[in-house]
Amino acid sequence: MEGKWLLCMLLVLGTAIVEAHDGHDDDVIDIEDDLDDVIEEVEDSKPDTTAPPSSPKVTYKAPVPTGEVYFADSFDRGTLSGWILSKAKKDDTDDEIAKYDGKWEVEEMKESKLPGDKGLVLMSRAKHHAISAKLNKPFLFDTKPLIVQYEVNFQNGIECGGAYVKLLSKTPELNLDQFHDKTPYTIMFGPDKCGEDYKLHFIFRHKNPKTGIYEEKHAKRPDADLKTYFTDKKTHLYTLILNPDNSFEILVDQSVVNSGNLLNDMTPPVNPSREIEDPEDRKPEDWDERPKIPDPEAVKPDDWDEDAPAKIPDEEATKPEGWLDDEPEYVPDPDAEKPEDWDEDMDGEWEAPQIANPRCESAPGCGVWQRPVIDNPNYKGKWKPPMIDNPSYQGIWKPRKIPNPDFFEDLEPFRMTPFSAIGLELWSMTSDIFFDNFIICADRRIVDDWANDGWGLKKAADGAAEPGVVGQMIEAAEERPWLWVVYILTVALPVFLVILFCCSGKKQTSGMEYKKTDAPQPDVKEEEEEKEEEKDKGDEEEEGEEKLEEKQKSDAEEDGGTVSQEEEDRKPKAEEDEILNRSPRNRKPRRE
């Protein structure tokens, strides 16, 4: 309303200026001043389109567990309190890199959109890193599910390295300040990447109930494309859920990317086969594995020439006219000069380099002409007997099966070795890997609340700071230049079709333009036919009138030159009827 009122004022003042143009100069100046004031008021009332729209502010508050947890840390205290740096050395490694001397810090992300939100940061590159913390109490695999969740942000991307966690097995020998790569763990979970191989590990160590030996069991690879989680430099939430019924789920950003069952979807399988191949069994010497054999009764045909060449000279070819038989194809370069440092005793007699014979350029060829070769129609090659089914074929030999002496059946692989600590034991060629909001719990609701209060705020802050749709399209095109072609076609094609549609319409003929009347309109052809009929009818009427007038004249002359009043009245009426008949309003209606 305010904008409309200001526009009305501008119109009124503009009218006043025009009316006062012939008036006093002082009045004109006053009106112009008023107009300038109104224009300034309109400009001031316009919104500032240059300033970017303010993003909704997201206030950070450290998450607090809403129930019982085995472990939780948001690092918002700003210290490594509760975490222990390893002092161990890695075995079978050069002393220069054997130490776990990688640096860890607690700090905010480099481009944090949540002031006050801190995390654990792997600071150095090309070093071994190891840090761990005790759980509030050991986790026992009984009737409750296990849920492990934490956040990772590859702030500088990732070349080669991991961001996985290890749940360290509860053993009497567990010493966190000596945590290293061979420290026993129960579960390893999290992202890992080297080259173009993007992984999301879920590995658990299963104890053989017969031998007591532990063996790693790897979950199947996720079907989802994991590359974006490593390259987009955003914070991602990784969740592992293990249930007492042996089912598992792996989630990224609260969406399932992998799921399965510990009994069916691990490699190698938890339970070995009931039977195995007998390692002592040997294939018999007379075992025939050949499905086809040469026909022993086949005989080489008498006319089979094994010595015939595959190619023969073309006898029908003729030497092209102008062929220079006496000219060599290459000649010494006449412009070449012997190098000054050429030593004939050491280098031998100097010879000019060969160049293409210039006389051959205008000829079909030079040198001795030879007939071209063609395929020999009589060539058959080495004769071989045809193959037939082997009547003695016994199939592919396999050793016999015997009962597996190491067979066992564990129907509850969920009941793994209890663990009492969480650790990060990593090697990375990229620094500034950000970890945050670790939680280990048995209640999904508590974990979801923790995620909403931590990762959920990060996601909201990132969404508030993200560019609009156009900005996101431009960013995507910068990463994938071929998208520019898609954008151009998407915009240009509809415009082209609209222009083509608007410019290619057929022009209507004048015969199809209707008159502004409610009366039925004739088609062009019918209208022309009616005009011809009316013209012929008019000519006949004129001819009849002329004859009538001549007859009346002659009658009048016979009657003494007098004309009756009745005849005088009939004449104007006939003329009026003729005019009415020629009027378009009295035409016949168009025939359907």
Curated annotation (Swiss-Prot):
Gene3D superfamilies: 2.60.120.200, Calreticulin/calnexin, P domain. A lipid is attached at C502, C503 (S-palmitoyl cysteine). Phosphorylated at Ser-564 by MAPK3/ERK1. Phosphorylation by MAPK3/ERK1 increases its association with ribosomes. Palmitoylation by DHHC6 leads to the preferential localization to the perinuclear rough ER. It mediates the association of calnexin with the ribosome-translocon complex (RTC) which is required for efficient folding of glycosylated proteins. Residues 503-592 are annotated as: Sufficient to mediate interaction with SGIP1. It is found in: Endoplasmic reticulum membrane; Mitochondrion membrane; Melanosome membrane. The modification Phosphoserine is found at S554, S564, S583. Residues 276-409 are annotated as: P domain (Extended arm). The keyword Isomerase does not apply. Belongs to the calreticulin family. This is Calnexin. The gene is CANX.
